[in-house]
């Protein structure tokens, strides 16, 4: 079997101008980045913004193994299959972060015969969005430090600056740094740190903004620090929201590429799902909905993180609500949740599949709490056995959830036909009746408690002293009516990554909150979630290279 990059490089790409004709996008609607990549113009976005939206399909997953369960691959394969059965379909995905690409992932543009192309470009610098976000974030840091250096008219307490610098790499050495050293000419010394770019609030803002004016307003509302009297300092106080918007004026436009089968793909934005809301941009999803009859999109990690945030944070900003949710499951992940060691996941173990089904079952029940029908997609692997597949199908039948085996990695669109037909049946039955888990009027404590007890299956929430103090402070500032974005491990329903399956009776501990008032949500930190990842012992970068003719090697 060819590697992902070998498959990608064997495909004869069509000019992007030709690919997008099928959804009504013309040459003059594009800002080209070579032959195969483009940004969609605001003229076209505005032209279709009042059109009736099509059907929306959200792809999510069970709590994953470290390798992931193939949401992007399944999303791409499903979109290709929907097109193959005659449904005009677009896909809306997140952009990969270079840090994980060079670290553990090696690439994030799908896999096998379900990829978006050109995958080398998408995984590396693409159209420069990540660089623009990094630059805007760090320009804010520089302007903030300069304000303090030039007299600090706002009375900013340097001990209470909460804005960090970013870089789009995994670099643990930058988590905690000291800036301003070297004497008076080099600024005021203070503690600082770096996050990875996709953890930046500016990434979240870019993905929730509906136009340039909304982007500017959200940037103005970012809290960067506190004064000596403990009142918040916003970007608007520094009067720099215009400059930041200028840096992002092109990055806000969605990117257009294609799948192996020529499905138009909007790939735009990529906030982390365990520390941010984990969804591609509202602009990309909304525009796809108005251009196509079916739009397939995804939300990061398991349904307890990405899907909950998609439904509680992103959906209220969309022109329609999901008509179906596809939950990707693998037999290896179910066996892991059933107690099998990671080294033994390729061995047949029907009982472990049955034991691990509790994890998938809870995700199905959770999606139904939002009033949306679920479909289970079994992402097929070579090591899967007929007995294991039969057991999983039987268990799905018992809870009355449609289930289909999909082999899109190996067989592309053909491997997703059964799944596509089932999804269409569910969507056209029109049983979706979306409702949020909580209302804006609920307090932050009430919102978190609902997520913990109704989605995670936990017993209660413990707020540490710092978090309790912040709750009082945030209520005074009027931030308590914002949605909650939970930051926790993706591997478990709990805040303990080793508590697998569908645990009950546990407590979730909130150690502190991070206000993301520009993005419009409050992040609740649990456990030891890192905003700057480190590299593994053998990073994927060690296998990467480029040939004399410029061909990329080692991306996967």
UniProtKB/Swiss-Prot annotation:
This is Formate--tetrahydrofolate ligase. HAMAP family: FTHFS (MF_01543). Belongs to the formate--tetrahydrofolate ligase family. It catalyses: (6S)-5,6,7,8-tetrahydrofolate + formate + ATP = (6R)-10-formyltetrahydrofolate + ADP + phosphate. The keyword ATP-binding applies. Pathway: One-carbon metabolism; tetrahydrofolate interconversion. The lineage of its organism: Bacteria, Bacillati, Bacillota, Bacilli, Lactobacillales. GO terms for biological process: tetrahydrofolate interconversion. GO terms for molecular function: ATP binding; formate-tetrahydrofolate ligase activity. Its EC number is 6.3.4.3. It is an enzyme of class 6 (ligase). ATP binds at residues 65-72. Keywords: ATP-binding, Ligase, Nucleotide-binding, One-carbon metabolism. InterPro entries: Formate_THF_ligase, Formate_THF_ligase_CS, P-loop_NTPase. It comes from Streptococcus thermophilus (strain ATCC BAA-491 / LMD-9).
């Amino acid at each position: 079997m060819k590697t992902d990059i070998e498959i990608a490089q064997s495909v004869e790409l069509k000019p992007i101008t030709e690919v997008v004709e099928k959804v009504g996008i013309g040459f003059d609607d594009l800002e080209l980045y070579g032959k195969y990549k483009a940004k969609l113009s605001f003229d076209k976005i505005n032209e279709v913004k009042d059109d009736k939206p099509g059907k929306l399909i959200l792809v999510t997953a069970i709590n994953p193994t470290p390798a992931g369960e193939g949401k992007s691959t399944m999303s791409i394969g499903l979109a290709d299959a929907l097109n193959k059965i005659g449904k005009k379909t677009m896909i809306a995905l997140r952009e990969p972060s270079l840090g994980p690409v060079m670290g553990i992932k090696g690439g994030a543009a799908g896999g096998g015969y379900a990829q978006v192309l050109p995958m080398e470009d998408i995984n590396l610098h693409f159209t420069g969005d990540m660089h623009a976000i990094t630059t805007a974030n760090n320009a804010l840091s520089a302007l903030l430090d300069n304000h303090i250096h030039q007299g600090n008219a706002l009375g900013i307490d340097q001990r209470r600056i909460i804005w960090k610098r970013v870089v789009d790499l995994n670099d643990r050495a930058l988590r905690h740094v000291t800036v301003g050293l070297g004497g008076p000419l080099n600024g005021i010394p203070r503690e600082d740190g770096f996050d990875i770019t996709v953890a930046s609030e500016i990434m979240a803002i870019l993905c929730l903004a509906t136009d340039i004016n909304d982007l500017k307003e959200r940037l103005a509302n970012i809290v960067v620090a506190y004064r000596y009297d403990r009142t918040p300092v916003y970007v608007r106080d520094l009067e720099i929201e215009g400059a930041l918007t200028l840096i992002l004026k092109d990055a806000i436009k969605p990117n257009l590429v294609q799948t192996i089968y020529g499905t138009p793909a909007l790939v735009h934005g990529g906030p982390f799902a365990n520390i941010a809301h984990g969804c591609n941009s509202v602009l990309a999803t909304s525009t796809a909905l108005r251009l196509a009859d079916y739009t397939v999109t995804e939300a990061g990690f398991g349904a307890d993180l990405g899907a909950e945030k998609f439904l509680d944070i992103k959906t209220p900003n969309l022109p329609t609500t999901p008509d179906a949710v596809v939950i990707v499951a693998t037999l290896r992940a179910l066996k892991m949740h059933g107690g099998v060691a990671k080294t033994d996941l390729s061995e047949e173990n029907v009982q472990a599949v049955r034991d691990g089904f509790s994890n998938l079952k809870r995700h199905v029940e959770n999606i139904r709490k939002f009033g949306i029908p679920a479909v289970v997609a079994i992402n097929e692997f070579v090591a899967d056995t007929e007995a294991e597949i039969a057991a999983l199908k039987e268990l799905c039948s018992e809870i009355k959830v449609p289930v289909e085996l999909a082999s899109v990695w190996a067989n592309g669109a053909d491997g997703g036909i059964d799944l596509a037909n089932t999804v269409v049946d569910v969507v056209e039955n029109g049983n979706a009746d979306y409702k949020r888990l909580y209302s804006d009027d609920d307090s932050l404590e009430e919102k978190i408690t609902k997520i913990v007890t109704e989605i995670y299956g936990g017993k209660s929430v413990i707020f540490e002293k710092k978090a309790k103090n912040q709750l009082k402070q945030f209520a005074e500032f009027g931030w308590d009516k914002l949605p909650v974005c939970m930051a926790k491990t993706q591997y478990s329903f709990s805040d303990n990554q080793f508590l697998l399956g569908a645990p009950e009776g546990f407590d979730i501990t909130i150690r502190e909150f991070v206000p993301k008032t520009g993005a419009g949500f409050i992040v609740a930190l649990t456990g030891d979630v890192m905003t700057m990842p480190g590299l593994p012992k053998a990073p994927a970068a060690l296998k990467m290279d480029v040939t004399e003719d410029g061909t990329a090697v080692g991306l996967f």
